[in-house]
């Protein structure tokens, strides 16, 4: 009788793992050590777990349970949220079970982004604790619950509609339920398709408002999964593109509401006149002016022909970037296109106009039609280079569709 013994885990492994589709890869007659075989068993188990999780995600019964809300804040407020040696943010994480991260503190960048992910209850509780932490750090431990504060959430453009609701119905409903005031910026932030949603109120009101906002986004994800997969270009703080303005007032996080945000807000806040149109002479010295008259003699990236299908107005409004960075100057350009091609520029379900916005980072607003006018006005706002690229893309789209229509008209039946 042989005295040699073998562990059950090794001898039974070839028969037990055959149930899994991820079978062990072992050559016949090959000597395999116990450690190698155990590692192979773990590999198979991990693959099986991954396949089960994939199947769970694909099942119709699986519904999203977590939401992701981002808050834009100043660097000094982000440091208050983190707390001394990370004590404050660690306490918020432990008490809410939410995952909280803060973007890197980059030198010269005045803003940071707070990322909060979790269930609706956890996210709302986390934001309630965040605003209370901001008030406590300003010395309002006793009556901080009665002081109003504002936070700025970053919401992708395609999700803002579900928060606003039809004719603002959902926005007003959240205000009534929470006693907070909500302000949705009408335009996208530059170089992204994020919009600002400002919540103003006492900590309890912000807590309740963020809960209903999270719930609204979660319901939208479940009801319209196809719309939720749209690609988002998230706002990234830079030293050239600052959204928030710090007035050095305690207990306030302020930004200019209901207009397109730009970095000149801080620079021009102490000047009597903002965004004055610059004369053609001055424009030619600072940033090249893009007009049908000047484009024929233009250099660099501009082609040597008149831009077809687009009428470009002279004298764009320029917002100078900090430090006189000419390439980062923001311009607001007015152009006109033929009324007949407005639908072509927009595209089905806004596909083409959104593509131009995403590829250039510009904000493009199509004004309402004017009775009796054969042209439609478009307002393009972005960096100088990006706005010119947007104009070229719009012109190119009209030219292609015009040529296709002409070809169909001439082709025999």
UniProtKB/Swiss-Prot annotation:
Residues 66-130, 148-213, 330-394 form the KH domain. It is found in: Nucleus. Residues 1-23 have a biased composition (Low complexity). Pfam families: KH_1 (PF00013). The keyword Transmembrane does not apply. GO terms for molecular function: mRNA binding. GO terms for biological process: regulation of gene expression; regulation of RNA metabolic process; telomere maintenance. Keywords: Nucleus, Repeat, Ribonucleoprotein, RNA-binding. Interacts with PAB1. Present with 1590 molecules/cell in log phase SD medium. This is PAB1-binding protein 2.
């Amino acid at each position: 009788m042989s005295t040699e013994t073998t562990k059950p885990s090794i001898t039974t492994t070839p028969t037990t793992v055959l149930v899994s589709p991820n079978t062990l890869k072992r050559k016949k007659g090959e000597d395999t050590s116990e450690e190698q075989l155990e590692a192979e068993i773990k590999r198979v188990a991990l693959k099986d777990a991954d396949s089960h999780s994939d199947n769970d995600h694909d099942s119709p019964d699986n519904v999203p349970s977590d939401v992701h809300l981002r808050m834009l804040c100043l660097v000094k407020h982000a440091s208050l949220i983190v707390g001394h040696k990370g004590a404050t943010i660690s306490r918020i994480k432990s008490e809410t079970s939410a995952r909280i991260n803060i973007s890197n503190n980059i030198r010269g960048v005045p803003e940071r982004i707070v990322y909060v992910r979790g269930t609706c209850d956890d996210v709302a509780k986390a934001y309630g604790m965040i605003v209370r932490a901001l008030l406590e750090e300003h010395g309002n431990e006793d009556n901080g619950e009665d002081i109003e504060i504002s936070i700025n959430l970053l919401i992708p453009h395609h999700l803002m509609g579900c928060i606003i609701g039809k004719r603002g119905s959902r926005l007003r409903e959240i205000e009534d339920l929470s006693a907070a005031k909500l302000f949705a910026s009408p335009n996208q932030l530059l170089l992204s398709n994020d919009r600002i949603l400002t919540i103003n109120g006492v900590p309890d009101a912000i807590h309740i408002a963020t809960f209903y906002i999270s719930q609204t986004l979660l319901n939208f994800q479940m009801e319209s999964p196809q719309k939720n997969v749209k690609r988002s270009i998230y706002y990234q703080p830079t030293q050239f593109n600052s959204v928030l303005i710090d007035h050095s007032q305690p207990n306030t996080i302020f930004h200019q509401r209901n207009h397109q945000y730009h970095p000149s807000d801080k620079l021009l806040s102490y000047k009597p006149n903002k965004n004055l149109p610059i004369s053609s002479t001055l424009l030619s010295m600072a940033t090249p002016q893009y007009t049908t008259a000047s484009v024929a003699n233009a250099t660099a990236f501009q082609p040597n022909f008149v831009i077809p299908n687009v009428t470009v107005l002279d004298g764009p409004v320029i917002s100078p970037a900090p430090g006189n960075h000419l390439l980062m100057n923001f311009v607001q350009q007015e152009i006109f296109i033929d009324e007949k091609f407005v639908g072509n520029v927009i595209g089905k379900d806004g596909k083409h106009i959104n593509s131009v916005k995403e590829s250039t980072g510009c904000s493009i607003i199509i004004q309402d039609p004017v009775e009796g006018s054969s042209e439609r006005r478009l307002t393009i706002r972005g960096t100088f280079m990006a706005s010119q690229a947007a104009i070229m893309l719009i012109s190119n789209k009209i030219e292609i569709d015009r040529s296709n229509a002409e070809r169909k008209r001439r082709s025999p039946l």
